[in-house]
Amino acid sequence: MKKIILVAGGTGGHFFPAVALGEELIKRGYEVHFITDLRCKQYIKQDMKVIFHILDLKRSGNIFLFLPRLSIAVLKAIKLLYNMKPSVTVGFGGYPVIAPMFAAIFLRVPIIIHEQNSYLGKVNKFFASFAKKIAISYEKIKNLPEFAKSKIVVTGGVVRENIRELKVIEMSSRGLTTGSKKSLIKALDSVVKPRHDKLFTIFIFGGSQGAKLFSELIPASIQILMQKQPSLELNIIQQAALDDQVKIKDIYSKLNITYEVAEFFDNMALQYKEADLVISRAGASTIEELTYIGLPAIFIPLPSAADNHQYYNAQLLADEKTGWCLEQNNISAGKLADKILDLISNPKILEDASQNLLKRRKEGHKLLSNLIEEVI
């Protein structure tokens, strides 16, 4: 049985797509090993079929500290890969992949890199010259070296299986006057209907780096929104840190709206089912999931994201009229409230965005697996 190594770490945004790819490859008869770092250890579940290996590389701004750490990590990776004898190594970018990718190059194992974002990251750009193929999620990608263009294959991103099973969400088009429900998207294979049939549902999540801002901004925006339209029927589903939940719930209770506030949602598919609109950061995996199910979003990119890639992701979708980009440095509760009200008042805008998203959808798990098999 041929062995394939996947390398991803740092955040769930890198981890879960790689696991989804691994599950597809296992179905095709391959033995899949996954090298990740300590930060992603929390995401590993017993029912995951890939074989995990923890290889941690701590970052340091001090080059004299980082180089010895990198050297040790590379030696460990060489030993690991030498014993496995993989047919190919696939890296998803970010510094956790550095040591295994160096090891693969040293052992002459073919490498493929996958760039989830619309901006080629520094690590992927460095390894581009060594890669057999470069899989990308977006047809338009920034920071791509000229020599690498011949290696490019557009596969789209990889979406988790439980999200893929949703197929297409039947969105709700609710005018402020009628509150009526009509289907925006006809089912391709199946339809999942929101549980809150009469309420316009907004799902807000920001990840570990974004929840604090959203805990302050979103309730303030909803307050303004309800002041402008007191008769509006809303359902708010929001991710928030434990320390912020009491204050948020108090605000929503006083507004007399339906809400659910939690620190973490184990199964995002359940929340996606209900949502008519998402407010989130603009990480690649989030965008791929929303694209796959045709769920429009207002994106507030994380300014500190590497190479400002979240801004480029969100702006690309805004340019294609598949989403809306509001920059954190320029946003206010009033501006966000106005944008939400505009979308609720003009359901055709949501309908068009949803349809445009579905036009972008790709079966990334299959296309990337096909590419890997070509290299093998």
Curated annotation (Swiss-Prot):
Q: Which GO terms describe its biological process?
A: carbohydrate metabolic process; cell division; cell wall organization; lipid glycosylation; peptidoglycan biosynthetic process; regulation of cell shape
Could you give one GO CC term from the UniProt record?
Answer: plasma membrane
Reactions catalysed, as given in the entry: di-trans,octa-cis-undecaprenyl diphospho-N-acetyl-alpha-D-muramoyl-L-alanyl-D-glutamyl-meso-2,6-diaminopimeloyl-D-alanyl-D-alanine + UDP-N-acetyl-alpha-D-glucosamine = di-trans,octa-cis-undecaprenyl diphospho-[N-acetyl-alpha-D-glucosaminyl-(1->4)]-N-acetyl-alpha-D-muramoyl-L-alanyl-D-glutamyl-meso-2,6-diaminopimeloyl-D-alanyl-D-alanine + UDP + H(+)
Recorded hits in InterPro entries, A to Z, give: GlcNAc_MurG, Glyco_trans_28_C, GlycoTrans_28_N, RPE4
Its chief place of residence is membrane
Chain positions recorded as UDP-N-acetyl-alpha-D-glucosamine binding sites: T11, G12, G13, N117, R160, S208, Q310
An example Gene Ontology molecular-function term? UDP-N-acetyl-D-glucosamine:N-acetylmuramoyl-L-alanyl-D-glutamyl-meso-2,6-diaminopimelyl-D-alanyl-D-alanine-diphosphoundecaprenol 4-beta-N-acetylglucosaminlytransferase activity
Q: Which family does it belong to?
A: Belongs to the glycosyltransferase 28 family. MurG subfamily.
Q: By what name is this protein known? A: UDP-N-acetylglucosamine--N-acetylmuramyl-(pentapeptide) pyrophosphoryl-undecaprenol N-acetylglucosamine transferase
Organism name? Rickettsia rickettsii (strain Sheila Smith)
Organismal lineage: Bacteria, Pseudomonadati, Pseudomonadota, Alphaproteobacteria, Rickettsiales
User: Which gene codes for it?
Assistant: murG
